[in-house]
């Protein structure tokens, strides 16, 4: 098939490919052959990078709620602010320290530019802390050097080195604090790799790390400028060109301008990084920082402990939405309201069969479903592991099929419909969705099912219907196996008593109906208990041919024999209703 696409007419002449701006050449890359086997060190920057991107920055109260959430989840390095940039951030850092809010195993991180009065204020904010990371940065990219700072490479190096020296000097003013260092060549992705390595190596020399007290070198995609593999190549190249690699923690800080921050973080980690900075649900400047929730649960679904607790994901989401005053989109990876929901009929059928197969496998092994590997089509994670229920997994609209409808009836009402009945009832539901549009919730599906198969009082169905109603039954059997059936049967406005014999209650009842002038042939019969308890209701499903019409009936009763007879009544009444309705529809 020949493509019919045509040029867009957009001004592509204004833009240069990344490879024409920054050379990243690593033909002997090794990262594609590696596998992730353990979680990286995480640093949550919601309170600094995330907060500065909010239309309405967090109040001190919301900041504290966010900090406490991050601690509960298990983050051990948390960037809590830019204390020299605002009194609000300074006061928040002080409140965490003075109120004893920082657990002993959690290290706060504070950001500062490489200017003396800002560095002095930063160290002042840290007095009394047990330990802290001072995060020093200055911008290094070609564009920033030329447009913002109007200086050369040496000028940028001088800024970084002076900042590092000042940090070491002011460290002496807070001897009670165990100070660690992080340096970021901001706008790293727009910086020549040779220059990025040079400035990082020079800063490391000033900060004097050891293998026991490493310095963090953070290599941010401040603006995402290329595909994730290019970022990974640059990280592997940097790891090879750091003079004191064994004294350095290589950290990643991807932004999501091109929509590939998660991939960039994962590939950069493969390429040799040790640590990743990001925000819950990808909050942050422009299109956001890398999503720590997506990264963590990605690991979890590969059988790797993220070392972060996502077991109450909806609670995490609610808290983040409150603090950020931003909604988490419905399709946000792992956390959105619709990410475990299937509307498509084929997807629903596969999910239903997946649940059934897992239950069967677990039963065969004599274990619970939670003790065997998760394997359900279209659900790469068990929603219950993240605190979700199965209620929203399958939802029904005009795109849905028999699998979704059958799943909801089984999940919510314990009805395990035979396959041909699933097909029949899904057609009934499809007619509703086509006529009314939108989604049909489980409660409405149950109402439709009752109206179609289980004639009931008017407060439970759309309309009272059905020629026949079974009001009482009595059976007896002789030693020869013959069953005698006596029934009280409402036929329209009259109540009749009738009796017949057969090789079982069903056969006898079919004779009763034949005596009433109704020709019924039984094609299939299935029954099951609605629960495992001794007083469980029984559900019976019968496939009938009534006056040449083939359809199903359903009966539910405490007695399985009565349920089977009610199922026959259901099928007969449906056949009669169909013959009444078809002329009405033809006349419309």
From Swiss-Prot:
UniProt cross-references to InterPro entries, sorted A to Z: 2-isopropylmalate_synth_dimer, AIPM/Hcit_synth_CS, Aldolase_TIM, IPM_Synthase, LeuA-like_post-cat, LeuA_allosteric_dom_sf, LeuA_N_DRE-TIM, PYR_CT
One cellular component term from this protein's GO annotations in UniProt: cytoplasm
Compartment(s): Cytoplasm
Segments of this protein annotated with the region Regulatory domain: 456-588
Catalysed conversion reaction: 3-methyl-2-oxobutanoate + acetyl-CoA + H2O = (2S)-2-isopropylmalate + CoA + H(+)
Binding site for Mg(2+): 49, 253, 255, 289
Subunit structure comment from the entry: Homodimer.
Cofactor(s) recorded in Swiss-Prot or TrEMBL: Mg(2+)
Xref: HAMAP family: LeuA_type2 (MF_00572)
NCBIfam families documented for this protein: leuA_yeast, PRK03739.1
Native source species: Clavibacter michiganensis subsp. michiganensis (strain NCPPB 382)
One GO molecular-function entry: acetyl-CoA C-acetyltransferase activity
Name of the protein in question: 2-isopropylmalate synthase
Phylogenetic classification of the source organism: Bacteria, Bacillati, Actinomycetota, Actinomycetes, Micrococcales
Domain Pyruvate carboxyltransferase: 40-314
SUPFAM superfamilies with a match to the protein in the record: 2-isopropylmalate synthase LeuA, allosteric (dimerisation) domain, Aldolase, post-HMGL domain-like
């Amino acid at each position: 098939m020949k493509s019919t696409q045509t040029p867009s007419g957009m001004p592509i002449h204004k833009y240069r490919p990344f490879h024409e701006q920054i050379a990243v050449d690593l033909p002997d890359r090794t990262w594609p052959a590696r596998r992730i086997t353990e979680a990286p060190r995480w640093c949550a920057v919601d309170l600094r990078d995330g907060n500065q991107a909010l239309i309405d920055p967090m109040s001190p109260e919301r900041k504290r709620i966010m900090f406490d959430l991050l601690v509960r989840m298990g983050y051990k390095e948390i960037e809590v602010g830019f204390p020299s940039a605002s009194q609000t951030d300074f006061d928040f850092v002080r409140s965490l320290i003075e109120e004893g809010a920082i657990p002993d195993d959690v290290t706060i991180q504070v950001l500062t530019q490489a200017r003396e009065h800002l560095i002095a204020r930063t160290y002042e904010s840290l007095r009394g802390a047990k330990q802290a990371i001072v995060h020093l940065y200055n911008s290094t990219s070609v564009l920033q050097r030329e447009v913002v700072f109007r200086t050369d490479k040496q000028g940028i190096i001088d800024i970084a080195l002076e900042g590092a020296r000042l940090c070491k000097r002011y460290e002496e003013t807070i001897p009670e604090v165990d100070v660690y260092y992080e340096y970021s060549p901001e706008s790293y992705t727009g910086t020549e790799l040779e220059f990025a390595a040079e400035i990082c190596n020079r800063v490391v020399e000033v900060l004097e790390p050891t293998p026991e007290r490493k310095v963090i070198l953070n290599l941010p995609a401040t603006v995402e400028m290329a595909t994730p593999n290019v970022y990974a190549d640059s990280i592997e190249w940097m790891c090879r060109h750091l003079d004191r690699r064994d004294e350095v923690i290589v950290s990643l800080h991807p932004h999501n301008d091109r929509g590939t921050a998660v991939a960039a973080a994962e590939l950069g980690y493969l390429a040799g990084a040790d640590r990743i900075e990001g925000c819950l649900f990808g909050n942050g400047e422009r299109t956001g920082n890398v999503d720590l929730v997506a990264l963590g649960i990605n690991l979890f679904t590969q059988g790797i402990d993220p070392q972060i607790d996502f077991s109450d994901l909806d609670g995490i989401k609610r808290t983040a939405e409150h603090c950020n005053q931003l909604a988490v989109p419905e399709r946000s990876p792992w956390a959105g309201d619709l990410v475990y929901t299937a509307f498509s009929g084929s997807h629903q059928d596969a999910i239903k069969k997946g649940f059934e197969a897992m239950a069967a496998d677990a039963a065969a092994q004599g274990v619970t479903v939670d003790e065997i590997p998760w394997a359900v089509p279209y659900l790469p994670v068990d929603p219950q592991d993240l605190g979700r229920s199965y209620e929203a997994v399958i939802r029904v609209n005009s795109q849905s099929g028999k699998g979704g409808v059958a799943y909801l009836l089984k999940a919510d009402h314990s009805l395990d419909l035979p396959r041909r009945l699933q097909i029949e009832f899904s057609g009934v539901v499809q007619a509703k969705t086509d006529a009314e549009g939108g989604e049909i919730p489980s409660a409405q599906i149950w109402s439709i099912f009752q109206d179609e198969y289980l004639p009931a009082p008017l407060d439970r169905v759309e309309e009272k219907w059905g020629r026949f109603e079974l009001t009482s039954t009595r059976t007896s059997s002789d030693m020869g196996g013959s069953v005698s059936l006596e029934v009280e049967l409402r036929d329209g406005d009259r109540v009749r008593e009738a009796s017949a014999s057969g090789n079982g209650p069903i056969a006898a009842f079919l004779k009763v109906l034949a005596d009433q002038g109704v020709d019924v042939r039984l094609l299939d019969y299935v029954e099951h208990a609605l629960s495992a308890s001794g007083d469980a209701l029984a559900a019976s499903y019968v496939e009938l041919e009534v006056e040449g019409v083939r359809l199903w009936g359903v009966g539910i009763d405490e007695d399985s024999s009565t349920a089977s007879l009610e199922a026959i009544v259901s099928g007969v009444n449906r056949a009669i209703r169909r013959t009444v309705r078809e002329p009405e529809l033809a006349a419309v």
